[in-house]
Swiss-Prot record:
The gene is gh. Growth hormone plays an important role in growth control and involved in the regulation of several anabolic processes. Residues 1-17 form the signal peptide. GO terms for cellular component: extracellular space. Belongs to the somatotropin/prolactin family. Its main location: secreted. This is Somatotropin. Keywords: Disulfide bond, Hormone, Metal-binding, Pyrrolidone carboxylic acid, Secreted, Signal, Zinc. It comes from the Eukaryota. Gene3D superfamilies: 1.20.1250.10. The keyword Protease does not apply. The lineage of its organism: Eukaryota, Metazoa, Chordata, Craniata, Vertebrata. SUPFAM superfamilies: 4-helical cytokines. Zn(2+) binds at H36, E186. GO terms for molecular function: growth hormone activity; growth hormone receptor binding; metal ion binding.
C-alpha cells in the first residue's frame, strides 16, 4: 500500500513539475517578445523625438503629461508594491488587456520602416502567448472576465480633433503611450514568470 501511495506521489509530482516547466517555457517566450517590443518602442520614440525641434519636444511632452493613454482605462497596479502582491492570473489578464488595446492603434504605427512593420505581427504573437498562459494558469477561485469579453474605451484623444499639429501630436502620443504600455506588460510578465520559481527574488 505504501509503495502505491509513493508511486502516485511521484507521478503527481512529475506531472506538476512538467506543468511548471511548460509554463516557464511559455513565460520565457512571452517575456522575450514583450522585451523586444519595449526596446522597439523606445527606439521608435527616440528616433521620432530626435527629428523634432527642441521647442516642439517641450510642447508635445507638456501636452502628453496632461493627456492620457488607453492603459489609463485598464485597472492595473498603482505601484511596484501592488504589482508584487498581484496574483499571476491578474497580471496576465491585465497584460492581455494592454496588448489587445493596441491591435487597432498599432496599424497607425506601421509603415515607413521595417521596424514599424514589426509591431502588429509581434503584438499578435504576444497576445496569443499570453492567452495560452492565462488558460494554463486559470484558477476557478479567481474570478476574472473572459478575455473574449474584455472591452476597452477608444484610444485616448487619438480620434478627437487635435488642432494645428494634429499629425505630429498623434504620432508623439501613440509612440509615447506604446512605449509606456509595453514597459508595463514587460514588468507584469517578468513578475508573473518569477512567481514560478519559489526561491527567486521577485523584487522590482
Amino acid at each position: 500500500m505504501n509503495s502505491v501511495v509513493l508511486l502516485l506521489s511521484v507521478v503527481c509530482l512529475g506531472v506538476s513539475s512538467q506543468q511548471i516547466t511548460d509554463s516557464q517555457r511559455l513565460f520565457s517566450i512571452a517575456v522575450n517578445r514583450v522585451t523586444h517590443l519595449h526596446l522597439l518602442a523606445q527606439r521608435l520614440f527616440s528616433d521620432f523625438e530626435s527629428s523634432l525641434q527642441t521647442e516642439e519636444q517641450r510642447q508635445l511632452n507638456k501636452i502628453f503629461l496632461q493627456d492620457f493613454c488607453n492603459s489609463d482605462y485598464i485597472i492595473s497596479p498603482i505601484d511596484k508594491h501592488e504589482t508584487q502582491r498581484s496574483s499571476v492570473l491578474k497580471l496576465l489578464s491585465i497584460s492581455y488587456g494592454l496588448v489587445e488595446s493596441w491591435e487597432f492603434p498599432s496599424r497607425s504605427l506601421s509603415g515607413g520602416s521595417s521596424l514599424r512593420n514589426q509591431i502588429s505581427p509581434r503584438l499578435s504573437e504576444l497576445k496569443t502567448g499570453i492567452l495560452l498562459l492565462i488558460r494554463a494558469n486559470q484558477d476557478e477561485a479567481e474570478n476574472y472576465p473572459d478575455t473574449d469579453t474584455l472591452q476597452h474605451a477608444p484610444y485616448g484623444n487619438y480620434y478627437q480633433s487635435l488642432g494645428g499639429n494634429e499629425s505630429l501630436r498623434q504620432t508623439y502620443e501613440l509612440l509615447a503611450c506604446f512605449k509606456k504600455d509595453m514597459h508595463k506588460v514587460e514588468t507584469y510578465l517578468t513578475v508573473a514568470k518569477c512567481r514560478l520559481s519559489p526561491e527567486a527574488n521577485c523584487t522590482l
